[in-house]
């Protein structure tokens, strides 16, 4: 997992998208060191963007993006989503509302989100350099990103082997939502199609 994730929200602000991408590269390199030579990279949300970028830096057999942002309403939605995540995390920690409000008044994720926005712009500009087989997965009613990001990825990758799948009953975190079993089956079928 990326540095600062699944931790108090202040921890994520001590990191950056550049560190997270290095975490993805390190994960790939670890698999190679373990003897794996046919690696498919998959990622949810920002992880999907990193899967695309990783394919430009390492030899991959295929790519799966799930609800990966490419711009549009993404920056503001990520900011609001991150504030909501921070509030919920603080509630989960058992803090009272007054403490949460006080901590949130001092919680300013703008620099990290600015770096994230710049990283997304760079990845968007390089999508046309992706030529590996790809499965693009997107929910129709995504509350975090612009669902048209999926069409952008699909339309701009330079892969001859590409597919896009849409899901109408799930939210942004599709891997734990109503259609997760169908998503897993679609990914399995994609993996089986790679020779």
Annotate each language-model stretch with its function.
Residues 7-36:
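Catalytic nucleophile-loop/oxyanion-hole region of alpha/beta-hydrolase
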Residues 43-47, 51:
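Gly/Ala-rich beta-loop-alpha elbow adjacent to hydrolase catalytic centers
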Residues 64-75:
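Active-site nucleophile loop of the alpha/beta-hydrolase fold
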Residues 109-126:
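Active-site nucleophile elbow and catalytic-triad environment of alpha/beta-hydrolase enzymes
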Residues 130, 136-138, 142:
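Short beta-strand/loop motif that positions the catalytic acidic residue
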Residues 132, 146-155:
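Short alpha-helix in the alpha/beta-hydrolase fold that links the catalytic acid
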Residues 155-173:
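Catalytic histidine neighborhood in serine/cysteine hydrolases
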Residues 169-195:
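Catalytic active-site module of serine/aspartate enzymes centered on a nucleophile-bearing elbow/loop
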């Amino acid at each position: 997992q990326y540095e600062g994730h699944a931790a108090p929200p202040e921890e994520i602000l001590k990191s950056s998208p550049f560190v997270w991408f290095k975490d993805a590269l390190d994960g790939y390199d670890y698999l190679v060191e373990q003897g794996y030579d046919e690696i498919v990279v998959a990622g949810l949300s920002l992880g999907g963007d990193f899967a695309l970028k990783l394919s430009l830096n390492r030899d991959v057999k295929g790519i799966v993006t799930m609800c990966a942002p490419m711009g549009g309403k993404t920056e503001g939605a990520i900011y609001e989503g991150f504030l909501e995540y921070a509030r919920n995390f603080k509630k989960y920690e058992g803090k009272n509302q007054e403490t949460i409000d006080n901590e949130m008044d001092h919680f300013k994720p703008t620099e990290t989100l600015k770096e994230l926005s710049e990283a997304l712009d760079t990845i968007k500009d390089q999508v046309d350099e992706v030529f590996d087989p790809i499965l693009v997965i997107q929910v129709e009613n995504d509350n975090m990103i612009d669902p048209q990001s999926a069409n952008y990825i699909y339309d701009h990758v330079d892969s001859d082997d590409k597919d896009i799948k849409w899901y109408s009953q799930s939210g942004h975190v599709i891997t734990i939502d109503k259609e997760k079993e169908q998503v897993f089956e679609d990914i399995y079928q994609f993996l089986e199609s790679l020779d």
